[in-house]
Amino acid sequence: MDKKTKKHRSLYIPYAGPVLLEFPLLNKGSAFSAEERSSFNLLGLLPEVVETIEEQAERAWIQYQGFKTEIDKHIYLRNIQDTNETLFYRLVQNHLEEMMPVIYTPTVGAACERFSEIYRRSRGVFISYENRHNMDDILQNVPNHNIKVIVVTDGERILGLGDQGIGGMGIPIGKLSLYTACGGISPAYTLPVVLDVGTNNQQLLTDPLYMGWRHPRVTDDEYYQFVDDFIQAVKHRWPDVLLQFEDFAQKNAMPLLNRYRDEICSFNDDIQGTAAVTAGTLIAASRAAGSQLSYQKIVFLGAGSAGCGIAEQIIAQTQREGLSEELARSRVFMVDRFGLLTDAMPNLLPFQTKLVQKRENLKNWDTDNEVLSLLDVVRNVKPDILIGVSGQTGLFTEEIIREMHKHCERPIVMPLSNPTSRVEATPQDIIVWTEGNALVATGSPFDPVIWKDKVYPIAQCNNSYIFPGIGLGVIASGASRITDEMLMSASETLAQHSPLVKNGEGLVLPELKDIHIVSRAIAFAVGKMAQQQGVAVKTSADALQQAIDENFWMPEYRSYRRTSI
């Protein structure tokens, strides 16, 4: 069946009347045709006029503009999503640049903090530790049989906001909204999940409105057994699903990824997605400057799982460009709250050990400090690139940025911490402190900076450039695993779509209006690499492209015909 026929054929629906209107995936509201209203017992349940989806979207846009705060806009959009998903995605598609920061970062942070307060209607699956023995039954309660993408969190490290308990559910919901809005994955194929293992947030534990399990967090063997029970139940119900780990605490994120990435098709977006989009941004920025990433010296502030994941991706890329592993690692410097990571530092985490600098190689540094601060590192390394993943605001001080600029004419500065309140430095300050010479990319959206009558666009190094395309590529190719090479192919493809690289001007990352083009291209690259790696069945390029096209969902109403259950 060709793509056009498949996407325009009628759907046979067993629901009718108010039940149909309460089904978000199927509800059309005022767009039900006269024939459908008669067939599905909807006569008199809707206003007389039959509207198009564009007319509905225009009304929703007018209503949206009436809300003054970002959190109220978020609540409004979530209400549409929970009543008419097709309309929700048409509205978001029409206003993606305006609405992406509202449905996801930074506004989703406030929505997570206030989750129990603003709760309206259930979405997704809440699995509490108290119900751990009912795991299979819980997943059987999900009405969608063909789930292809799950985003799961335990709510312990939500953005830079810490432990939000079940309030962390806002992240999987928002993330999956972007899988659909940016990557064309049908909402019928997606499932947000929160693992409710308690919370150590005392404010939540004493909040009478808090809807989660009121208990300190389960840890150690009990925690890992609970997660394993969930993974096994998922494999039993949906063996081919793509599982994305989201906002797990540092102590659990990497162990869970390493444990399950070869058991189920899975990845951690905080570690691997952030690494892929950052690497793609840096590849593009280096090429735009007529250079290569392998020529750059890079300093990180933040040596957690996300920062180390980015560093490892960069090291892999520079090895592809010709560096030895030893030389590649010698050009990357990791700084955390205890200073520069060195081989003399005790109590390093396993994923940090390969990213240390040899203390012996630092003996000629211009400093008497035993603990080497970020300023010490910048002064002695003279980096070309400074990346912030600390989750702490204001740590890129004027002194540090000006010191960097002394030795680098066009510094690349990337304060990536989310949400906006946690950013290491604002783009405005960085532009001023570098006399307009810095290339700035941030984790959260920022308006362009105007300095000395010149406009400086600020690229958002947003994972949504990467993970929707990866998801689409996995679904289209039928990949059983996500390999490092698949992630690197996504980074390379993103860099190839940089306006700054292609045109010599503009943003280092594509505009959001081109996100579907980018996601399709990444999906093809990821699917092709999956085939080369032997984790997907080999097909022709044309067949892979056809599979991508067939799986790319657009927010358009289908005609309905009634059938019995």
UniProtKB/Swiss-Prot annotation:
Pfam family, any one: malic
Q: Which residues bind a divalent metal cation?
A: 246-247, 270
Could you tell me the EC number(s) of this protein?
1.1.1.38
Q: Which HAMAP family match?
A: NAD_malic_enz (MF_01619)
Full protein name: NAD-dependent malic enzyme
Q: Note the subunit structure.
A: Homotetramer.
What PROSITE patterns does this protein map onto? Answer: MALIC_ENZYMES (PS00331)
**Entry's family note:** Belongs to the malic enzymes family.
Cofactor(s) demanded: Mg(2+); Mn(2+)
In which residues is NAD(+) bound? Answer: 157, 270, 418
Residues under site feature: Important for activity: 270
Name the chemical reaction catalysed here: (S)-malate + NAD(+) = pyruvate + CO2 + NADH; oxaloacetate + H(+) = pyruvate + CO2
Query: From the Swiss-Prot or TrEMBL record, what is one GO molecular function term?
Result: metal ion binding
Does the UniProt entry include the keyword Metal-binding?
Answer: yes
Q: Recite the UniProt keywords alphabetically.
A: Metal-binding, NAD, Oxidoreductase
CDD domains recorded for this chain?
NAD_bind_1_malic_enz (cd05312)
